[in-house]
């Protein structure tokens, strides 16, 4: 007599293919595998999930395996820079310069503009003890090359900006998953109560593809979403109260508000969005003095400003953001991500002028940040 819960895996030459056999065998092992994973007999009652309220917070947590790093700064420069002109030299391209490509080209979403080979017009040189080849377009990077890992084998199964960016930031091409910064703050918490645990620093010329999804908490509680620091002053809006509400007046108001919010949350302790808003409001209060101090780069030395390129109009904006990123992690912020504008490296033409311009803006400040850390 056959069991109704386990599929029939009887095989005959007339009715079973290899695919059917493997499918039936795999299905029949599911109850056994689940029982083994849960360390319980097949006859045991199902384990009830814990549906009680969970406590999510930003308290600092110890990782399963200790490491030397306590924070991360990500310089996310969206687009596809010409690797053969920057960090992946191809001498054969120069030998075949302006020749017609001898093989067939499979075009996708790019126009069939040309089938001629174009060698790089820029010189490469090996730098550091590693001997890594770097283009003359990146003099700052060449000075810190031994502190940099160059990966030349990365690829993705999609060629659209949106999916690729989401894969880089969240690990999957599908939207809706938490960004890397959200996972880090969820797993490790924060080492400061005066500043956000996760900061996104945007570009004055606009957001990258997918916009705010780049620092989204996905299905994690809103507590782990990135906090935006603007590229222009005031970098954080509405941080300081009106003059009439400052001092004791504000303290009394916030004290009463905290009490009312606490009572409201006790009656709705499963509402994670409510808990996140309450936590963020209390954080905003503490940030009034701490954020102003962290964002004030005037306290840095003249030499530091010069190192980050802040005295140069071309590198000033990105240099300021790099310096602020360093000041944030020094004060306990767990994850800081700097974004460039939409399609920053997406050069579909005029490469000989547009690629150097993109390099000039970010090369010196980015190298200074790595060197300064």
Regions found by a protein language model. Name each.
Residues 2-373:
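Ligand-binding pockets and gating/stacking loops
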């Amino acid at each position: 007599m056959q069991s109704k819960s386990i599929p029939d895996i009887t095989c005959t030459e007339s009715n079973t293919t290899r695919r059917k056999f493997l499918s039936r065998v795999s299905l029949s092992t599911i109850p056994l595998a689940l029982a083994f994973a849960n360390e319980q007999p097949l006859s045991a009652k199902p384990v009830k999930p814990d549906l009680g309220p969970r406590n999510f917070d930003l308290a600092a947590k110890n990782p399963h395996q200790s490491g030397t790093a306590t924070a991360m700064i990500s310089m996310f420069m969206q687009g596809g820079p010409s690797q053969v002109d920057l960090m992946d030299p191809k001498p054969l391209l120069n030998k075949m310069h302006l020749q017609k490509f001898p093989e067939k080209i499979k075009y996708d979403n790019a126009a069939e503009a040309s089938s001629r080979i174009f060698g790089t017009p820029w010189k490469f040189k090996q730098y550091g003890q590693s001997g890594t080849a770097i283009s003359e377009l990146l003099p700052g990077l060449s000075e810190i090359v031994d502190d940099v890992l160059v990966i030349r084998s990365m690829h993705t199964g999609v060629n659209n900006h949106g999916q690729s960016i989401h894969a880089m930031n969240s690990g999957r091409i599908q939207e809706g998953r938490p960004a890397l910064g959200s996972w880090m703050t969820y797993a490790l918490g924060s080492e400061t109560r005066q500043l956000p645990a996760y900061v996104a620093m945007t570009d004055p010329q606009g957001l990258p593809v997918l916009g705010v999804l780049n620092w989204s908490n996905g299905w994690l509680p809103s507590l782990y979403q990135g906090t935006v620091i603007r590229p222009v002053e005031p970098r954080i809006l509405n941080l300081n109260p009106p003059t009439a509400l400052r001092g004791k007046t504000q303290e009394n108001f916030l004290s009463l508000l905290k009490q009312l919010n606490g009572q409201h949350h006790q009656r709705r302790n499963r509402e994670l969005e409510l808990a996140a808003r309450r936590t963020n409001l209390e954080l905003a209060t503490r940030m009034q003095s701490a954020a102003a101090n962290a964002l004030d780069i005037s306290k840095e030395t003249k030499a530091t400003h010069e190192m980050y390129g802040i005295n140069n109009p071309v590198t000033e904006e990105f240099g300021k953001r790099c310096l602020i990123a360093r000041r944030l992690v020094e004060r306990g912020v767990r994850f800081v991500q700097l974004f460039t504008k939409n399609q920053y490296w997406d050069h579909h033409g005029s490469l000989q002028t547009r690629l150097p311009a993109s390099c000039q803006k970010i090369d010196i400040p980015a190298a200074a940040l790595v060197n300064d850390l």
